[in-house]
Amino acid sequence: MNKLHLVLLVLLVIAATVCTPLVFAEGEIPADVSLETLDYIVDHSAQYEKLRQAKIDSCKALIASSDDISKSGLYNQLFGFYYGFQSDSAITCARKGLEYARKCNNKTDEISSIIHLATLYQVTGCYFDSKRLLDNLDHSQMNSSQLYDIYSCYANIYDALEQIACDSILAEEYTANYNSYRDSLLTIDPENVFFRTGILVDKGRLVEALQTMKPYCDSLDVNDPIMGAAAYVVSGIYREMNKTSLEKEYLIKSCHSDLMHANREYISLTRLAEILYEEGDIVRAYNYLNRSIEDASYCKALQRMDMAAPMLSIVNTSYKRMNSRWLKFLSGISLSLIHI
């Protein structure tokens, strides 16, 4: 074997050792939850997005063959498929649903479409536009499901405003409003495990919060779309407890679920990348943060982009330094072998 072949062989062995990926069949959804399977899902997101797109295409075909009376409800259904996936398209669906609801004098669907618009405005950072739409609605005309949605939207608006408030008095006001709407949600759905857990966390009763949420999360199938949110809440409790390894375990579960269901409006992957960076796993942290930014940008989830962007700058610098050292290392090996 000549020197050049020996150099190439050594470099290939090193590359294979560092970069060997998991391989799954086309369309297969890996059931085990680990960083390795998460790597696969991140790298092969297109196949999971195809599954969601198929539902969208099916609903579009149904709308095309339906009468005007049915279209407002079908557009609201299509909104659900686009929500968390493509915000621009979701807004279009909400507007089309509103148009047909008003055309057919369907008050229930009209209210649902307005709430959908307000929800999208909140996700994309238009908090006061969202609130303006909600403030103009007559709550007496709403069913319990619509009240639940409107209170959820109000709560999310005030939660987001509290996080960006530059005035402590304003922040306290936003927090009080958030708590008020969360309490209203509990009157509608007193058994809601998410809200009950949130109240326990706010009171510092972390063990009780964990005992409330963790069994529920662990009972979910790994393919259940609720897993993303449930696992993230559990990870947050472990974070408050300073139990990073357990926080990381549930963040991986949350990311697995969100990405597998092509949900682009998430936060778990950003937090997981932060932990991986602190552990020295620079390559994964870099890849995960880039994916977070891309998804948030595509979905126009402004708050998610704001959360991920500062961390990306730090990780990006470390990634470039690591690559520079890696190239120097490979060059050193090459030169050593050439002189054998």
Region locations from a protein language model:
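Membrane-interface helix-start motif
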Residues: 316-333
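Bacterial N-terminal signal peptides that target proteins for export
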Residues: 1-8
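Short, intrinsically disordered, charge-balanced linker/junction segments flanking boundaries
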Residues: 184, 332-336
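A "functional boundary" signal
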Residues: 19-321
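Bacterial N-terminal signal peptides
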Residues: 8-18
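Conserved small/polar residues in nucleotide/adenosyl-binding loops
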Residues: 338-340
